[in-house]
Curated annotation (Swiss-Prot):
Keyword terms of this UniProt record: Isomerase, tRNA processing
Gene Ontology BP terms: tRNA pseudouridine synthesis
Entry's Gene Ontology molecular function annotations: RNA binding; tRNA pseudouridine(38-40) synthase activity
Active-site positions on this chain: 53 (nucleophile)
NCBIfam families in the record: hisT_truA
Top-level enzyme category: isomerase
Family: Belongs to the tRNA pseudouridine synthase TruA family.
Classification via Pfam families: PseudoU_synth_1
EC number(s) from the headed UniProt entry: 5.4.99.12
Protein name as it appears in the record: tRNA pseudouridine synthase A
Signal sequence residues: none
Length: 253
């Protein structure tokens, strides 16, 4: 058996998320179908760096999987995966990794981007690739809120109730908002890990602050109280992208 690491991109619009689910179309299931063909039709179970929810996209999700036999030509393997998976999945890179390398448990940091259209009418061309908010937003207020998210915090107040993780302390290295033009914003979050729906809950809160329906100091209150009820709504999934998963260098195999 040989272990491979792959970097993939996908349009999450027509998926019920990344992780396999019964009677649902998922990214994991579609890739595993192709991997099985390339593995003499023996089942292959892949592991991802983490899951993304229904409607969430990825520029740089990372997976690993094992295939029978010796190491294969990496470009041929990448090409085979890329051309046989559906059009809403792209396989960007395939690498060899040690047998004990794990996409989820290897030390890494993740970067998410969130795209928001802020206009009177929503563009029909971006309805699956950007979130939408029609009411006025104050850029300076949102900037002030984002700064407060940087650092090591207990993010319980920004976690969905379905989270089963006990330790909710995470470190955010970068929390930035960029005004791309008068109608479009990009949020950037880079950290050592994120809880279930944490990014979308943070974005929903910052939007509410930008719309002057919460004070900038609300961020402090949420972090201190660890109370989800003090945070804003969960932002829509279509604006969220897993941009990059960055690992420590792999030793030569």
């Amino acid at each position: 058996m040989t272990r491979y690491k792959a970097t993939i991109a996908y349009d999450g619009t027509d998926f019920a998320g990344f992780q396999s689910q019964t009677n649902q179309r998922t990214v994991q299931e579609e890739i595993e179908k192709v991997l099985s063909k390339l593995n003499s039709f023996e089942p292959v179970i892949l592991q991802g760096s983490g899951r993304t929810d229904s409607g969430v996209h990825a520029f740089g999700q990372v997976i690993h999987f094992d295939l029978n036999g010796k190491a294969r030509d990496l470009e041929r393997l990448r090409f085979g995966l890329d051309t046989q998976t559906p059009a809403d999945i792209a396989v960007k890179k395939v690498e060899l990794v040690p047998d004990d390398w794990h996409a989820r448990y290897q030390k890494h940091e993740k970067t998410y981007e969130y795209y928001l259209e802020n206009s009177v009418t929503r563009s029909p061309f971006h309805r699956h690739s950007k979130a939408y908010f029609r009411y006025p937003l104050n850029f300076e207020r949102m900037q002030g809120a984002m700064v407060k998210l940087v650092g090591q915090h207990d993010f319980t107040g920004f976690t969905a109730s379905g989270s089963s993780v006990d330790d909710k302390v995470r470190t955010i290295y970068q929390a930035e908002i960029i005004q791309l033009d008068k109608e479009n914003f990009k949020f950037i979050f880079r950290g050592n890990g994120f809880l279930y729906k944490q990014v979308r809950n943070m974005v929903g809160t910052v939007i509410k602050i930008g719309n002057d329906r919460m004070p900038v100091s609300q961020i402090d209150k949420i972090l201190t109280s660890k109370n989800r009820n003090f945070a804003g709504p969960t932002a829509a999934p279509e604006g969220l992208y897993l941009k990059e998963v960055k690992y420590e260098p792999i030793n030569e195999i």
